[in-house]
Amino acid sequence: MTKEAGRGHALLVGAGILCSRLFGLVRQRVFSHYFGLSDAADIFSAALRVPNFLQNLFGEGVLSASFIPVYARLLAQHKQEDADRLAGAIAAVLALLISVIVALGIWATPSLLWLIAPGYVGEKRELTILIVRILFPGTGILVWSAWCLGILNSHHKFFLSYAAPVVWNLSMILTMLLFRHLAADRLIVYLAWGTVLGCLLQFLVQCGPVLKLVPGMRLRLDLRNVHVRQVGGSFLGVAIGRGVVQISAFVDQAISTLLGSGAIAGMTTASSVNLLPVSLFGMAISASELPTLSRMAGDERDAELAGKLSARLNNGLERIAFFIVPSAMAFFALGNVLVAALYQSGAFTHKDSLYVWAILAGSGVGLLASTFGRLYASTYYALRDTRSPLRFALVRLAFTAMLGLASALLLPKAFGVAQQWGAVGLTASAGVAGWIEFHLLRRKLNSRLGHTGVAWTLMAKLWVSAGVAALAACGVEYALRRQGPIVLALFVLSTYGLAYFACTYVWRIRLCVELVEKLARRMRIG
């Protein structure tokens, strides 16, 4: 497959994710308007993370890494019948597994809450238990959506699977608007039911197109099928690795419940902004590359094949860096403008915007490492190596726990600030752990494929360009400081984006030049 085709697939993934994330930002703005950083916001944010463990453990990332490589190879070999059998068998396994886990999760919710929200007591704890139990079945449905995504992606039908969460977001938005007259503690109960409805709708919009792609599929629990065994072997390793990542997130959440009211809601709000570049550029490129890398993968001892894989990986890393470097710089320098424009409304105050900006800046520390790491992990999965990412994820977990505890609980006291500000240290320390994991992923893959990574000269040019653009944007921010948040953001962020593209074009950075030339051709100038 050509680089142009790969970019086209990444563009489709990015377009789908952009639709989903934009509606996600609208959902978060409506949520922030009604709840701010209140106890109710903390409760729903924490509750949503508990069943999401199930989705992340068995859902999109794990199924993509274990199912797509095997399924895509069968399609490439024109074995449609075998591919259909595999799809049906995996669907049957998921149906059985998820039903059992959802039932156990609902029953064990009180015990789970002691682990991931030890700071919640009394009415706050009881309401969180109720919300978690409502949400669990919906999250099980989302795992089926991930199965749909695996099939659609393998057939290079990228847009629908990543745009489908739009209906999930719409369901939540409409629920909040319809029942906005209720008190916050009652509104979040209705919101939980609206979330479950959204999960069902997200699955249904993908179901029809998927069934057309697998005409011979039958739901059959065929555990003896050799291809099912291959998926199962990879699935276990990836699921454990993904579980480690989720445990890392739960460690952060458990610590944040000890930081006072608003900490979890603040981290969730910052995460909604942080996930936009991660999804648009990191996930889009990694997800679109996995089927192609899987088709290319074979014996990495073959020098020619190793060279092709390395070149493909490096090209993806350069594309990620071009967009993620300015995103991280924006979090550091312009996060206040961004957060205020998105969420400063109703119960969400200017003070809340500054607090979320600080958390967002902390998350910027590991933004590049986490997005690079996704593509490296996809390359390992394409090579059918799930153990290496697992080992490195365990290292990351250990550092996340140690650094997170120290940063969140000890540093605020050392600097004489409120304990709530420990959330900033929590996100920054997670970023440091992410860099350690990325270094380990890269070092081992380099020993197998040869040198990989982005040239330091290119990285330096990108950071300098982002820095110059940030200075220009800060100047505009100062000049227009009396304007409202949305108007201010339009001018400041436009200046930042244009200045960054101008600087990278002056540097003659390949991706920028190609984008400008493509735009010029479409406008029929030059």
Where are these regions (language model features)?
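Membrane-embedded alpha-helical bundles of multi-pass transporters/translocases
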Residues: 1-526
